[in-house]
Amino acid sequence: MNYRGIYRRRYVFVLLLLVAVVNISYGWTVLKNKDYKRRYLSPSGVEKVRKHLSRKYVASRNNTQTFKKHYFSNTWAVHIDPPDNDVADRIAKKHGFTNIGKIGNIEGHYHFKHEEIGERELEKARHKTALLNLEDEVKFAEQQKILERVKRDGIPNDPYFKDMWYLLNTGQASGPAGVDMNVVPVWKKNITGRGIVISVLDDGLDWTHPDLEANYDQTASIVLNDNDNDPMPRDSDADNCHGTRCAGEAAAIANNGICGTGVAYNAKIGGVRMLDGQATDALEASALGFRGDHIDIYINCWGPKDDGKTFGKPGPMAAKALRLGAEQGRNRLGSIFVWATGNGGLTDDDCNCDGYTTSIFTISIGCIGDHGLSAYYTEKCSSTLAVTFNGASHKEGRENKMVTTDLYHQCTEEFKGTSASAPLAAGIIALTLEANPLLTWRDVQALIVHTAQITSPVDEGWKRNGAGFHFNHKFGFGRLDANAMVNAAQSWKNLPAQRKCTAASGFDHQDIPRGDSLFINIPTVACESSSAQIAKVEHVVLTVSFVHRRRGDVSIDLISPKDTKSQMLSPRKYDDSDEGLDEWSFMTVYNWGENPKGIWRLKITDNPNQDDVMNLFNGDNTDDVESLEERVIDTQTKQNKAEWEKMRKENPYFDVPYPTGVRKDKVLGSTEINDNSFDTPHTETFKIIRNHIPEVNLQNNDNMNTLNFDPVTGRKKNSINKKIINSRKRNFLTFRNFLKKSKKVQVQQEETGTQRVQVNAGYENPRISCESGYTTCSGVLINYKLTFYGTGE
């Protein structure tokens, strides 16, 4: 056989094949390069690429795009009319779906799931949506977007500690004795939450925990992520402990020698597993509307990111579920939705940017530490109703421990954030509902307003509204007092039916001056001479739309006819968005009890260079009032402990009497400030000062600046400080002019130079067109609407 000829032919064949491949590759490269040059190297192509990259970067900085890997779920919300489960099953089967069931308590709305549609099969999903919408019985079908939701316990953990100082504070923590929730007197009345059902909407509930099992309620539990009835968390992931920890604070069993004690330790507890997976509007609506005929209180310790730049609110179905829960839940008395305000204080976040906490149907709960002072990550806003305790201190560093149940049948003292505060509030509300089961959802809120106690009394943020109620944007109406709330509930008369009055609206575009304020007077008769007339307001909702060069520079204040000021939006240094807001509803509870008739004032301010303002007026040498109070409290605590130790040596049976804490026994009248206004054993220093305070009227908050003495703190105002402040203001104005010049140069460089991968907060948005025709505005107010909720005469 001629092997040499065979090898030669094979060699020639391989050589020809390689030549062909090289030629084809070269030709393809030429065509590709020509196409590349035609598409991308032309001036218009380069500009398109630049704008595309710029948009992507701005979107990532402003958090306006959701993570795209899981943007759509494989579930649909389908509205079928007339509502019929058999029709829903037929339509679902016809198009390859599975009918999971009704969406919460919304009539005619069904949850469909398609197992064969992947997360990136958008065309196939659109085709399925179109087919569903062609059905005669289908009013609408919508594929569900996946919403990003985060748990609110992201605070560093601490070593183990067994004493629950927030339930009975005898001085075992670093703070003073008596600063607690005053829950022991309620337990002594045999009020322990019996007959009340609480459900935790979270990442699951380890109901087999020996400190929870006897109180577990299967009817109040479900798994919405997997359509199951067992809410056991996926304990392979240690982060899925959040719901179990919330449950333990509210309803852990007492007197069983295990872990700690829940506030309402005889209440029933359930869990809705909804955070262990993809969140959608339909899923949230299902959770918020789940078994409203059986569940009394829903604990919610989740929401949009606390990053200081996000605006997030319930979707249309979740918002409707909240409303229907308030209208129809608990046999039409109204479901109680307790919500944690968030932990975004370190990023200057504002809880009014969270549409869940600003809903009139939710009870927004903030947090304080063992000294009764605000936590270092506290968010301030006008929708906060009250505060309870958690392990945080006023300054970052020292932490106290919170005892609760944990995964693997363990006990932990490492629960932090407002997630540790909201379950305590839910427990107190459970005690209140046992004392009076006929309370409506509005009655519960009103009881909080009437009975919450002043905490951190020297804080200068305490004001009094036109109806005589104290409030503070850090603390709401104050710290929840279980005993005071239960006592008031036992003789409480239900509020009259709620009324809604759309008081005023404006649709004329108005400029927001650069570095200045837009003032709008809003006269209203509060729907006088109609069935919607309101004489006592409860919730005030301000809905606004505006565009602005930098949303984080905008602050919004609303002043009532009684001169009560609510900051509806505060500046946020990390919010670089230039998109403004579209029909965003801010809410305040701080006009509670006022007659809304009169002239309301709306103030919208552009606050450029807010960081420089804070540095000038709050330098390192400036002590905040709460830090000073903390040092005074610590001194008094040490003295008290020394006296107690001495008495124990003289009398071995001596025990510390139950302390009164920082409480007010009633809502003070406008001239009732006296030595007993803030009854606390460790504030003698402040009482000495108050001995010299003349009687003052707190009703007009704007006139308080003219007094020589601050009526809330009892401290003499220092005229030297005014000189210092005026000097700092002059320095600031000079510095701001310098920044304006620097900013102008920087803008010119950005416009004429190469695009940098950086978003500067000071850049002007070329899309904003000032109504005045000049370029002196920072933004434009598009419209506003003022809505009152309350009662008539």
Swiss-Prot record:
Pfam family, one: Peptidase_S8
Positions annotated as glycosylated: 62, 190
Tissue and organ expression note: Predominantly in the body column.
SUPFAM superfamilies membership: Galactose-binding domain-like, Protease propeptides/inhibitors, Subtilisin-like
Active site: 202, 242, 419
Signal peptide residues on this chain, from the entry's feature table: 1-29
Classification via InterPro entries: Galactose-bd-like_sf, Kexin/furin, P_dom, Peptidase_S8/S53_dom, Peptidase_S8/S53_dom_sf, Peptidase_S8_Asp-AS, Peptidase_S8_His-AS, Peptidase_S8_Ser-AS
GO BP terms: protein processing
Enzyme class of the recorded protein, top EC level: hydrolase
A single Gene Ontology CC term: Golgi membrane
EC number(s) from the headed UniProt entry: 3.4.21.-
UniProt propeptide residues: 30-152
Task performed by this protein: Probably involved in the processing of hormone and other protein precursors at sites comprised of pairs of basic amino acid residues.
Family: Belongs to the peptidase S8 family. Furin subfamily.
Listed name of the protein: PC3-like endoprotease variant A
Species of origin: Hydra vulgaris (Hydra)
